[in-house]
């Protein structure tokens, strides 16, 4: 190929040299011989050079097409020609061109010779083969160790630079092919094939010689000595069923066995050895039939029957040791003996009847009473156990302000019903709910779920259960952080019922058929019925689930020092609570429980302050802010019981524990006052405030049975009275009226906890005291005890079923139809029975009172006063009504047309009539006793009393009618002397 052809082939390089003559001139100016250029380019005139690589082409190929030719390469080629002349093939190596004038390299420190090269050569020869490795190592300048590549004949031609450049591409390609056999240009490598795991050969398991099993110890079981068995008191077990029935199938099986084995009592070896074999030898044809007729076994005539029977016994064959009787034989008279049926419920007394002496003196009949106790314990099995209730940590510590020592008037009047007021035209921005993951709350206790007061907010994504009380004023309510359980009670249909149904909310609790109701005797759980119940340590109440309307939601306001935040939240579950049944009674205002709880609350605060104090002392001012209802003098009086006052110098003194007092730990401090005690005390404060607002400034803790009828309903419905009445009624110590004024619903769907007399005082609904009483028998009650108890239980069931039907209604139209549309939208109900327009002030109704005053000049002036508090309005109206009733005579009472007023007048007349009737009966009985008249129509019975002083019959000597009363000499002789 000529030089011009090179330029033509490289036109695409755009180097700027389009004419080959320009390059020729350039080479000539530099003094370069053109023969060298032609030899490098592979001129056609030099055929030997056509086989060499085109250095210039490779130079252009390795360079960027945008760049021009590399002039340094041209200068280098020119210097080669000057040094070697035209015979360029005589060059031995390119290294001679560049390294002649360089100094020799010094040997490296710690040089180990050609060991590294030899190792690398061996590795390469292992991968590529010895011949290919030799070419590679010689091409890159490594020395080939001896023995690695076989010796070859010396090359006829000296390797030149062109040959090295020609082999470089082949060497690279061979190396790539060696390590990457599947390599192709422009194709992605299969890395799964390239980097496949190294194949591993399966190593067979090594054969292990089993160890010799040598027993560590030898145990021999020695049979019991027959002498010991014979001398033992325990007799051998008798062998029963000597006569056993045999079936037809057994007969056939035994007949077949006897046919196949005639000498089953003898061993087979014995039969073979004792058999006469000579008889079976066939000497001629005539003996064939004889042999077939003879038996293979021993002839029966040679065996003694008795001996065979004995052998069977010796060999242990018990098949023929029993007497086999045919039960179908009509001549046999057999009576089958049936197994005796054991009594599963064997009484305790039957076990003692064997000992006649002990049973003879069993006068107290204790076993029968033991049976009664056992039945009673199993009957109330599931109601005696208390479920565990665990409150939050801050609730057990009674953290302020959630647990106060004394509630304010505003907090008492709005007990657990804080008012939510908004400023007019104020913008409300709702914040997103705080995300709380339920997965993090799993397997955590109540203390871990709510460690601080921040976790009790409703403004998070946790599920909310809304429970609405059907009572206007429940007896007891829980505070923040206190836990309650929702228990689903299920009663079994029968003893075999093993089902355990589960609801979406609550835990299941199964009651047996005879178990007592969880609501004591004021509610029942029918067989196969599930009753959800609100359960805690203070109350129990039935729950009735309702569907949540899609338009209802919860508005939450969270107030803090930084402002108020508002949240909107869906209602996940909604329940309506029935009437609450108290578990513990509310203490009275001046009871010992209140005093003890107040002292323990003071001790709790003192112990915690002492732990934080460096010197173990405290000041009165530290306690005053927590007990706002007490002054410093009252606090000092209580501190003197367990603390002493110390003063040093002129400085202020401090209080310190006495030497015999010990500060308990935190657990002991928390146990002094429980959160339930605080709730009971708050309920007592609410009851006191309600009585004071109603005009009863003086509360009564204890009310006797004779005084119940004389007290107004407001005092009888105080929480410390109703709770005590209910607990006594559950224990059978009292009876309740069940209906009437104490009904919290006013429509007969709740129980009245007002106590009534157990001696005929209870009257069912619809029956009054004016009804004709039953005739009284001699030496009997004036009422029928069984009939009264039966009527009492029927009334309880009627009210329970009515409450269940009423609170289970989900349809608003049905609810309005049953109770009346007006009663649903009433804003305020004054009492449990009566609702009047003037006595039902709602939040938007006020009371205006006009008063007359005299000014300083004596003139009358009118002043108008407006009252907004509904409690005060109710007290004013009630007082006004009492004044009007007192000013109105009984003879002037006439129907007014107002149902509420007429009902009050009717009740007033009935009370006056009952009072007059009672006074008349008392006067009549007093007059009859004085005159000696029997009110039943019979005369006065004669008495057998005889006076020991005067001797007359009919009185005693201490009676004033005795003629010798008060005379010490007395006696019958004195009286006769006077006569």
From Swiss-Prot:
Q: Which domain of life is it from?
A: Eukaryota
Q: Name one GO biological process term.
A: transcription initiation at RNA polymerase II promoter
Question: What InterPro entries does UniProt report for this protein, alphabetically?
Answer: TAF1, TAF1_HAT_dom, Znf-CCHC_6
Major subcellular location class: nucleus
Any one Gene Ontology cellular component term annotated for this protein: transcription factor TFIID complex
Phosphoserine PTM sites in chain numbering: 244
Q: Which UniProt keywords apply?
A: Nucleus, Phosphoprotein, Transcription, Transcription regulation
Keyword set includes Transcription regulation: yes
Task: Name where it's found.
Answer: Nucleus
Q: Listed disulfide bonds for this chain? A: none
Single GO term (MF): TBP-class protein binding
Q: Does the keyword ATP-binding apply?
A: no
Q: What does this protein do?
A: TAFs are components of the transcription factor IID (TFIID) complex that are essential for mediating regulation of RNA polymerase transcription.
Query: What assembly does the database describe for this protein?
Result: TFIID is composed of TATA binding protein (TBP) and a number of TBP-associated factors (TAFs).
Supply the name of the protein. Putative transcription initiation factor TFIID 111 kDa subunit
Organism per entry: Schizosaccharomyces pombe (strain 972 / ATCC 24843)
Write the lineage as a comma-separated list. Eukaryota, Fungi, Dikarya, Ascomycota, Taphrinomycotina
């Amino acid at each position: 190929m000529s030089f011009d052809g090179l330029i033509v082939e490289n036109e695409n390089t755009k180097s700027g040299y389009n004419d080959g003559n320009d390059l020729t001139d350039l080479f000539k100016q530099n003094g370069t011989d053109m023969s060298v250029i032609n030899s490098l380019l592979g001129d056609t005139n030099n055929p030997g050079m056509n086989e060499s690589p085109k250095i210039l082409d490779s130079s252009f190929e390795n360079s960027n097409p945008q760049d021009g030719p590399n002039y340094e390469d041209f200068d280098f080629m020119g210097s080669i020609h000057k040094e070697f002349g035209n015979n360029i093939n005589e060059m031995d190596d390119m290294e001679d061109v560049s390294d002649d004038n360089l100094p020799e390299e010094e040997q490296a420190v710690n040089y180990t010779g050609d060991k590294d090269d030899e190792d690398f050569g061996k590795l390469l020869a292992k991968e590529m083969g010895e011949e290919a490795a030799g070419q590679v190592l010689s091409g890159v300048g490594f020395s080939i160790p001896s023995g690695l590549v076989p010796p070859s004949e010396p090359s006829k031609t000296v390797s030149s630079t062109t040959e090295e450049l020609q082999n470089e591409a082949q060497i690279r390609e061979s190396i790539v092919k060696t390590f990457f056999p599947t390599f192709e240009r422009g194709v992605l490598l299969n890395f799964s094939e390239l980097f496949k795991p190294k194949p591993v050969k399966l190593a067979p398991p090594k054969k292990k010689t089993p160890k010799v099993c040598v027993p560590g110890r030898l145990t021999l079981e020695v049979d019991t000595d027959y002498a010991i068995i014979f001398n033992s008191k325990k007799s051998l077990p008798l062998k029963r069923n000597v006569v056993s029935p045999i079936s037809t199938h057994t007969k056939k099986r035994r007949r077949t066995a006897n046919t196949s084995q005639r000498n089953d009592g003898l061993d087979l070896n014995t039969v073979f050895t004792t058999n006469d074999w000579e008889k079976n030898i066939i000497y001629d044809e005539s003996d064939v039939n004889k042999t077939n007729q003879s038996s293979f076994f021993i002839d029966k005539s040679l065996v003694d029957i008795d001996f065979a029977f004995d052998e069977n016994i010796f060999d242990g064959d018990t098949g023929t040791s029993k007497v086999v009787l045919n039960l179908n034989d009509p001549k046999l008279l057999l009576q089958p003996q049936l197994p005796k049926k054991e009594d599963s419920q064997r009484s305790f007394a039957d076990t003692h009847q064997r000992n006649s002496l002990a049973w003879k003196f069993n006068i107290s009949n204790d076993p029968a009473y033991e049976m009664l106790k056992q039945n009673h314990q199993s009957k109330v099995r599931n109601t005696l156990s208390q479920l565990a209730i665990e409150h939050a940590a801050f609730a057990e510590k009674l953290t302020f302000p959630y647990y106060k020592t004394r509630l304010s008037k505003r907090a008492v009047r709005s007990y657990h019903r804080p008012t939510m007021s908004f400023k007019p035209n104020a913008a409300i921005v709702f914040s997103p709910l705080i995300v709380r993951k339920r997965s993090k709350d799993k397997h955590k206790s109540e203390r871990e779920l709510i460690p601080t007061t921040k976790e009790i907010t409703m403004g998070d994504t946790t599920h909310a259960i809304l429970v609405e009380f059907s009572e206007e004023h429940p007896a007891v309510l829980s505070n923040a952080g206190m836990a309650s359980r929702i228990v689903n009670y299920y009663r079994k249909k029968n003893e075999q019922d093993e089902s355990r149904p589960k609801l979406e909310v609550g835990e299941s609790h199964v009651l047996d058929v005879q178990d007592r109701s969880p609501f004591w005797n004021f509610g029942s759980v029918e067989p196969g019925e599930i009753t959800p119940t609100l359960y805690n340590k203070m109350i129990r109440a039935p729950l009735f689930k309702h569907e949540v309307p899609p338009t209802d939601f919860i508005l939450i306001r969270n107030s803090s020092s930084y402002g108020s935040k508002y949240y909107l939240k869906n209602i996940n579950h909604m329940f309506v609570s029935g009437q609450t049944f108290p578990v513990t009674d509310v203490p009275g205002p001046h009871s010992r429980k209140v005093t003890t709880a107040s002292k323990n609350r003071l001790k709790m605060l003192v112990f915690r302050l002492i732990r934080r104090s460096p010197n173990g002392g405290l000041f009165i001012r530290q306690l005053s802010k927590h007990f706002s209802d007490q002054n410093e003098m009252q606090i000092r009086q209580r501190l003197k019981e367990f603390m002493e006052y110390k003063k040093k110098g002129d400085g202020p003194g401090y209080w310190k524990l006495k030497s015999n007092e010990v500060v308990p730990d935190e657990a002991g401090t928390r146990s002094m006052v429980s959160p339930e005690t605080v709730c009971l005390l708050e309920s007592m404060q609410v009851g006191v405030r309600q009585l004071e607002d109603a005009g009863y400034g003086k509360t009564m803790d204890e009310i006797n049975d004779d005084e119940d009828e004389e007290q107004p309903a407001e005092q009888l419905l105080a929480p410390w009275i109703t709770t005590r009445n209910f607990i006594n009624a559950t224990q059978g110590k009292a009876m309740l009226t069940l209906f009437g004024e104490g009904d919290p619903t006013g429509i007969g769907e709740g129980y009245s906890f007002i106590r009534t007399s157990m001696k005929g005082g209870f009257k069912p609904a619809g029956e009054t005291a004016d009804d004709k009483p039953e005739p009284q028998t001699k030496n009997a009650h004036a009422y029928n005890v069984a009939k009264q108890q039966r009527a009492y239980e029927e009334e309880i069931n009627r009210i329970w079923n009515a409450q269940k039907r009423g609170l289970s209604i989900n349809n608003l139209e049905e609810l309005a139809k049953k109770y009346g549309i007006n009663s649903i939208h009433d804003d305020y109900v004054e009492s449990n029975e009566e609702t009047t327009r003037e006595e039902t002030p709602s939040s938007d109704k006020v009371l205006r009172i006009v008063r007359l005053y005299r000014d300083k000049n004596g003139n009358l002036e009118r002043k108008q006063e407006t009252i907004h508090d509904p409690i005060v309005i109710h007290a004013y109206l009630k007082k006004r009504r009492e004044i009007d009733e007192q000013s109105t005579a009984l003879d002037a009472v006439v129907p007014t047309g107002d149902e509420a007023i007429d009902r009050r007048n009717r009740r007033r007349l009935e009370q006056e009539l009952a009072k007059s009737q009672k006074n008349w009966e008392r006067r009549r009985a007093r007059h009859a006793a004085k005159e000696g008249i029997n009110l039943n129509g019979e005369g006065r019975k004669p008495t057998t009393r005889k006076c020991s002083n005067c001797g007359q019959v009919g009185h005693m000597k201490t009676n004033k009618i005795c003629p010798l009363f008060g005379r010490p000499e007395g006696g019958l002789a004195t009286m006769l002397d006077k006569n």
